[in-house]
Amino acid sequence: TKLLNLACLIPGGDPMAKKKFGVHPYIPNSVPEVQAEMLREIGAGSVEDLYATIPERLRLKKSMELPEPLLSEVELKRHMETVLSGNTSCREALSFLGGGCSQHDVPAVCDEINQRSEFLTAYAGEPFEDHGRFQALFEYQSLMGELLDMDVVNVPTYDGAQAAGTSIRMASRITGRDHILVSDTVSPARLLIIRNYCRSDLKIEEVRHCPVTGRVDLTDLKSKISKKTAAVYFENPSFLGAVDDQGEKISDLIHRAGGISIVAVDPISLGVMAPPSHYGADIVCGDIQPLGMHMQFGGGHGGFIATRDEERFVREYPSRLFGIEETALQGEYGFGDLLYERTSFADRDKSKEFVGTAAALWGITAGVYLSLMGPRGMEEIGKTILQKAQYAAKRLCELRGVSLAFPKAVFFKEFVIDFNKTGKSVKSIQAALLREKIFGGVDLSQGFPELGQAALFCVTEIHTKEDVDRVVESIK
């Protein structure tokens, strides 16, 4: 514990003791006697010795301006409740927000299972003590494999954006190429993460979309594919909601050039949509948040990566893969890591890519959700979402000056509403709706300025006819 707490030591002696309230009650290591004992334990002469390798220009030269501490639990609780009371949650307001985090029904059993003490950790587990967790994650992988019609699915990575970045780097390693084509309808936030993952050695180039259908522009794609192209990455449905029925053509184009087809998909759509593996995808990735997870922002949603069971793909997974095998006892099976030597946990500084296990718990949650729903349940949810989204789009377009930004787009649960002819900004419409406790869609005017005043609306199985009618009347 003493060694782990060294990160809390502050250079320059004990600046916290110089504050008018003395030693900070939340930072035990600010006590001079505690610091001295820790330094003796590791044989260091001073706190400064611990930071000798850090250049002077990067060190903080002054005391941290921390706020006055709240000394009692009652004061702290009251302060936090006051801060949080400034928020309006989706429990209080009617939400049509999506764009990467959407509101779906979370069956009570999902929360019940993921809060059990034997599962309640973000970590994936250890082979000698976590057989139950390994089995649960193996079951998740199997269920996702069935949903995606793919052979291999990883233990969840941090989120869908990391899964996308990792899938692209896998494709680059497999092909030995450095040119990546990405659809320009990808979320600006996700594209930033992809660029960050790839900026050291890969070149990201965007492919235009059709302004009427929202689909990938095949002519532009053909002109940009070359023998240096490692992969084409597109999303189906896209961030802007459009379903692309050209998946097979896109995959054929990149395959002819010797590259890899990567498709990101919303897993809850697969009860009614064909999985990407059916139209040529080599790597399928995405976010499992719709599968039994509450909306949240600031933590891992859980991302998945799926491929065929081919060595050239499996060897490039940086994340953990769990398998099943017979034990020495007849009729008994064990669950454990496959090809562990390819992971960053084994290769450390020589690994191809680093990955953590911060979202493994969500894999168990998604496994519970999928086992509860089954194929028929997923189909029912998909059909319900389709019907409700179509009704919402139709009702909104009945308003004066309101239309679909992509009039010929096929969409699943999200669609772009064009407010340009209303003479009002999305920001002003959102503000008016918020006063009525309604979140009216994601403002696209910054991320996609070419669309002008447009908003991305998300409708799922939780929305009722009355909910849709309410937002329409409020906008009117």
Model-identified regions with their sequence ranges:
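Hydrophobic alpha-helical scaffolding
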Residues: 24-28, 40, 66-70, 130, ...
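Short, Lys/Arg-enriched N-terminal segments with co-localized hydrophobic residues
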Residues: 1-15
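N-terminal entrance/gating region of PLP-dependent enzymes' catalytic architecture
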Residues: 52-139
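Conserved PLP-enzyme active-site core in the AAT-like
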Residues: 26-27, 162-334, 401, 417, ...
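Conserved C-terminal alpha-helix-loop-beta "cap" of PLP-dependent enzymes
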Residues: 376-470
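Short loop-beta-helix segment that forms the pyridoxal 5′-phosphate
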Residues: 127-129, 145-165
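Charged, compositionally biased N-terminal leader segments and the immediate start
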Residues: 13-31, 38
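Active-site C-terminal subdomain of aminotransferase-like
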Residues: 291-400, 404-408
